[in-house]
């Protein structure tokens, strides 16, 4: 893929335990470098999303931030192939998906030498969930974190996003 991929291709890690809104695949085509977008029904908050203000990613809302630079779900990002190719050349072909539970996404994205603020927010500035973690077992609805309703997130996408859950 890195050596023979078509120019302007986009890499997205789809998973069999997710449900996708078909509109997502049109959005993915817009990925120039790295794009980020919300994932529903994930973590204790029920949502993992970039926080967007004035069209820019300014932080993350996730049930487990830890010390991750990119606290995102595997289904919450896409990468333009040219970005992967450049990173691969810088690293002499040593791009990898690290296997450290909870850190795979962060470890992979850190190799790209891209900052979260430089990523493109998709899904109407991250105000629409187009990917859902769905599994076939019973669970109670995740409580909406009351912190998301505070002034800390005022003038961001989270108000619209949480109202849609």
Regions found by a protein language model. Name each.
Residues 107-128:
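Catalytic donor-sugar/metal-binding loop of nucleotide-sugar-dependent glycosyltransferases
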Residues 2-14, 18-102, 119, 138-154, ...:
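Conserved catalytic core of nucleotide-sugar-dependent glycosyltransferases
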Residues 134-136:
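Short beta-strand-to-coil "C-cap" segments at the C-terminal boundary of structured domains/repeats
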Residues 130-132:
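Structural motif
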